[in-house]
Amino acid sequence: MKKMLDLLSAEVAKAFAEAGYDEKYARVSLSNRPDLCEYQCNGAMAAAKEYHKAPIMIANAVVEAMQGSEVFGEVQAVNPGFINMKVNNEYLSQYLNGMEKDERMGCEKAEDPKTIMIDYGGPNVAKPLHVGHLRSAIIGESVKRIARFAGHKVIGDVHLGDWGLQMGLIITELRERKPELVYFDEAYEGEYPAEAPFTISELEEIYPTASGKSKQDEAYKEAAMQATYELQHGRRGYQALLKHILNVSVTDLKRNYANLKVDFDLWKGESDAQPYIPDMVQKMKDGGYAYVSDNALVVDVKEDTDTKEVPPCMLLKSDGASLYTTTDLATIVERMKLYNPDEIIYVVDKRQEMHFIQVFRCARKCGLVTDKTELKFLGFGTMNGKDGKPFKTRDGGVMRLEYLLKDINEEMLKKIQESRPMEEKEAEETAKIVGLSAVKYGDLSNQASKDYIFDVERFTSSEGNTGPYILYTIVRIKSILRKYEESGKKAGEGKIGAGRSDSEKALQLELSKFNSVMETAFEECAPHKICAYIYDLANAFNKFYHETKILATDDMEAQSSWISLLLLTRRVLETCIDMLGFEAPEKM
């Protein structure tokens, strides 16, 4: 189904051609003065230069050619040469009925689907998820859902931090505490126990303890580095411990991500890419790309057009150890070999931009990807507290993600219980659903690259540009539809009719933008565009609702039409919030 703006542009193009002007000037856009018109075309202004005529003369001629159009209800030429338009009410309602019949509500599916990998999440194993992991998870999940809706094959990868010194630190601390464990006996050749020698709680306490010790005790740090080296060079007992660390951590991470309604297709980590490093580095040397500088192995990635310095991409340190860049490049090699993606999107902190400029350029220069492979950096800003500084606990620590969600749910539960009587269990379930909308919408309504203030009071409000307000609107629609059916009528039997009031038409106009918004959100990796859209749509619905006696009217034809309009509004809103990663309860 074509987008409304494309249909209107095609109609205006016919008029430009009939008036003797090039159709390329006929592009229609949404009006920037909705008080005057719904759509506008500024093409006469540009055409004036080519045809050496006053813009208003061209606009008048085009408007003349548009008389009698069934697409437009009103058309006006306005000085100095704007063409203002209002769409025909009947034409608009026909468009919405077409949307209603289509299971995708007018959204085209990709003709040539791509394989897209999204690298998001990125938690370190053996550490609890904290608020710093929130944005990557929420934005990545939404971008994944939007791309799937657009018809592409999408693979989400959590890309665990499961390699490097942190593993050596855990092994060293574990050895100090439980030296009798079979994993530390180098002579042992049997099977290792299936059960981990620690719980998630112990693991989360072991790492910070070990990290603290390594900063105070040089010998301890040396032991941890040696353990890391032995792990990375295949020591059996340490490899078995790594498996336990991963299993225990990933089980806990999955539980926490599930509470966020975030899931991944792949639970791979940095360790999975390690086998690809030796061959990759050798090829870079053989190809003449990698060279030794200050005893480190590097690849030059600067370009003549650079406006700031881009340092060489370091592959190996002077001691032969790999770095994040090495692992990220090897991960690209692994992904190309196993999944051959057309596009890889990295949803990471925007402060890592230089790192990824180096990685992407190195990957291209050394032929790790094809000419057609797109590597995208989707950098996000910081989630700040009300003081404008990175969000912390009251005592200045980094807040665990599960505690943040608990705080939000408790605030939401309090508001729900204050607003209406509800059974405790139902109220708690509703608070979880609405609380998640508060967190996700609060984040996603901001452009990803921008910093934002995490304000519990504002995000949990059922008024204003918030998740609970959107859900409140959906619940209101569900309630009206329920009452309509309880009166013995069947919803959806009537067609959506031409708008009978300004507020009804305004709602219909908002609905007609749906496929255009979804397309833009996919192309720009921009969930905030969906948030802005559903806020406008919810406002348009609520204005229509307050001005219209939907259930109290005696006009059955109008009522049937309105109910069909409500069904479409609910479908669009529910599809959009699914793209954002949350759902609506039955009651609030």
Model-derived features: where do they sit?
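Non-catalytic interaction-recognition regions
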Residues: 1-93, 110-588
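Short, charged beta->alpha transition segments
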Residues: 101-110
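Short, charged, solvent-exposed linker or helix-capping segments at domain edges/interfaces
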Residues: 94-99
